[in-house]
Amino acid sequence: MTKKEVGHNFLARLGKKRLRPGGITATNWLIEQGQFSKDSHVLEVACNMCTTSIELAQTYGCSVEGVDRDPKALEKARANICEAGLDELVHVQQANAMKLPFPDDSFDIIINEAMLTMLGDEAKIKAIKEYLRVLKPGGRLLTHDVSFTEERMGEQLASLRQTINANVEPLHVANWQKLFEEQGFSSVKLNYGKMTLMSIPGMIKDEGFWGNAENHLQRFEKRKSSAISKNVPFL
């Protein structure tokens, strides 16, 4: 991994498809809350290479719009969509979560994983307000981010930032709930568990055994900071 390369980009170069803090366990829990069907119109914000969007379309036959700011990730996403034969159901475009290119009341469900944590306080509010704007009345927001369960986590936060080489801004579990409720969301349901994104067991659970990538992952494991071993939870 280069000095300035963000951790999840490094993992993507090694072939990792699930770039989420709580891995497939957290994503599956979110999807269970979504009540997806073939009639659902879904938006995935920060879709990356569209692993989740593709699985949703394959499983439920729903239509999915994906947005991401990274043109390289979107290039991979388009290739993955084409390979899966889902060009009619899954579409992607470059866009900013704080200024979504969709009309009001467009979507039944929004899924957003591992992005709000990357934003500062004001940007979080702007993004969440945009989600509320483009959701239909009664729509659902499914979000998967990093949270803390203890009040004082300054040292662990510094270690986490160093580990993934990004200035992340996770919140306490209670503060995440307060943030969503203050922006107009109701019936906020929370779940949290261990952060598995950059652990070898988590990678194996998410992706299976990787063959040629295994040695690279073992070398990366040695570089981890203590933040990962402290079980920083996901929201």
Over which residues does each language-model region extend?
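A short acidic, Gly/Pro-enriched loop at the edge of an enzyme's catalytic core
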Residues: 98-110
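A short glycine-rich, Lys/Arg-flanked "PGG" loop and its adjoining helix->strand segment in the class I
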Residues: 125-140
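Short, glycine-/aromatic-enriched active-site segment of Class I SAM-dependent methyltransferases
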Residues: 14, 146-167
